[in-house]
């Protein structure tokens, strides 16, 4: 079995980008968000029980303990600009088919080819931070977020048993937050058995690969 540290250690440190989108692109994306809401909670979209949330994060429940939804509820809502390699809103297609981002992803993996798959946004209200670490952007041959529950794919990653079928993916994560309280990005450059690092707020138009 592959060790936990090697499974979760990033292939390279995050690359920080300033001005990820132009002011015009940002304005058009915000317009789509405002015109097409309301947006549902992330929890409602991806999980059917508190146990599935735990499987995605810590993966363990003490014997005799029953988790409840109120343990995980937070004001974090999600919508999609693009899914399954298709832009859902033509007016922001250039934001999705972003050649700058594709170049960064190819460079991150040392790959010849890359294709954009999904583009989503989160709207987050004030809430407690410091939740359990989790895995994003998992995909295996024939298994993706389009046909498989998120909690199951993340469990597959944590076992280390499916590495042969795991596909190479990267994310470009962008923030628009002018505050200085909270809002940072925690990551584990040496895997979960070592300490975390943080990219601190404010983060207006800042992105990481």
Language-model features and meaning:
Residues 1-101:
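N-terminal auxiliary "cap/dimerization" subdomain that precedes the catalytic jelly-roll/cupin core
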Residues 91, 97-111, 119:
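Hydrophobic alpha-helical segments and helix pairs
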Residues 106-115, 124-209:
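Catalytic core of non-heme Fe(II) oxygenases with the double-stranded beta-helix
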Residues 14-16, 120-122, 207-208:
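Ordered hydrophobic segments in well-structured contexts
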Residues 48-49, 118-126:
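Short, glycine/charge-rich beta-strand/loop segments that flank catalytic centers
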Residues 7, 119-121, 156:
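Hydrophobic alpha-helical segments, principally membrane-spanning helices and signal/leader peptides
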């Amino acid at each position: 079995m592959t060790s936990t540290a090697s499974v979760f250690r990033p292939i390279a440190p995050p690359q920080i980008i300033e001005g990820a989108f132009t002011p015009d692109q940002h304005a058009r994306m915000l317009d789509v968000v405002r015109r097409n809401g309301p947006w549902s909670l992330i929890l409602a979209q991806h999980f059917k029980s508190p146990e599935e949330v735990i499987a995605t994060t810590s993966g363990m429940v003490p014997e005799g303990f029953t988790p409840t939804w109120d343990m995980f509820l937070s004001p974090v809502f999600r919508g999609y600009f693009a899914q399954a390699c298709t832009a859902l809103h033509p007016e922001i297609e250039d934001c999705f088919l972003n050649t700058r981002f594709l170049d960064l992803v190819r460079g991150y993996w040392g790959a010849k080819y890359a294709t954009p798959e999904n583009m989503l946004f989160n709207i987050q209200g004030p809430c407690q931070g410091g939740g359990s670490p989790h895995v994003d952007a998992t995909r295996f041959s024939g298994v993706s977020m389009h046909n498989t529950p998120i909690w199951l794919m993340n469990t597959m990653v944590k076992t280390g048993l499916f590495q042969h079928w795991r596909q190479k993916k990267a994310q470009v994560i962008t923030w628009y937050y002018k505050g200085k309280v909270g809002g940072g990005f925690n990551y584990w450059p040496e895997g979960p058995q070592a300490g975390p690092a943080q990219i601190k707020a404010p983060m207006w138009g800042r992105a990481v690969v």
